[in-house]
Amino acid sequence: MIYENLDSIDRTKAHRAKLTLLCEARQGTRAWVRVRLDDLSQAGFRITWLPQFSLGMPLRIRIPSMQVLTASIRWHSGKTLGCEFAEPLHVAVFEHIVRNAVIDGPLSR
């Protein structure tokens, strides 16, 4: 498993993994859309491509082999969104997702 523990200054204060994982996301009653999850921590994630998103509306994400999770969009840049989980992932859940994803290497900042 490739991830790094960020120092206490980082706002996520959690393990972080750079990975590639195809998921589905939606807001409200909109249709599910395929998105690429590129970055994951216990606190949140970064996805690419969610057309017509709304910053104030909760986002639901379906990660393979997981229940639907709820998150809030915290930032966006072009087709990339940074999201925070409504409830942080338990470390065992985080490690399960990372183990089942394609690992690109540790995230460097």
List the model feature ranges, each with a label.
Residues 21-26, 56-65:
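Short conserved beta-strand and strand-loop elements enriched in small hydrophobics
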Residues 28, 42-43, 76-81:
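Short, conserved beta-turn/loop elements at beta-strand boundaries and strand-helix junctions
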Residues 29-31, 65-67, 79:
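Short acidic/polar mixed-charge low-complexity motifs
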